Amino acid sequence: TVKEERYTSGVTQYPPLLSPILALRTPPGTKMVVTGFTGPYKLTDEVRNQNDEIVHICAGSGVVPSFSIIKYDLRVNEKLKHTLVYSNKKHEDIIFDEELAQLKRDFPDRLKVIHTLTREDDPTSFGENIRGGRISQPLLSEAIGSPEKTAVFVCGPDHHPWQKKEAKEKGETLPTSFLQSALGFLAELGVTKDQITKESYG
């Protein structure tokens, strides 16, 4: 069921984009076509052939496209190693927790997963490679090691253009987003822009 999102000027953060079209302008019986992977957030042959490892830095539901890449590549190819740095608030928020654990058992030499939990009192009690706090430069340095022959995929929350516009009009500074933090740390570690594939939501 698709419900129309309402928009009230001055109250709603920004106008809804898709739900009014689906809820109000799409008659019953309309056929929809669901396509495969599109857009820049995908593992191309060029990236696969030029690198030995892919490091994925994700937060929340941003893990979904990277999980698809990891799962497919581990099963279809034999070369690349993958490291996933995955940030959530609570342990119960981890998406694909069991699936990732199974992939680690199936491919112990090719997949490493590091979880960071920002709102757990004792995150290490949940198991190995589970850390507390937000992503940091030392954590990404540990995950990446030497940036040579490494590509990085980053997916997580960033500020929506409407938020940026509103903050600018009010003369306010928005807090640093997950995506901004990750890209800043990567630059400090010497990872170049052409090594990074990014996607955000907000």
Annotated model-derived regions:
Residues 53-57:
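Conserved beta-strand elements of the Class I
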Residues 63-77:
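Histidine-anchored nucleotide/phosphate-binding helix
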Residues 59-60, 157:
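A short acidic Gly-Thr/Ser loop motif
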Residues 1-30, 88-90, 118-120:
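Ferredoxin-reductase
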Residues 9, 39-48:
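Short, Lys/Arg- and Gly-enriched loop/turn segments at beta-strand edges
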Residues 85-202:
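Reductase modules of NAD(P)H-dependent flavoproteins
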Residues 50-52, 74-82:
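Conserved S-adenosyl-L-methionine
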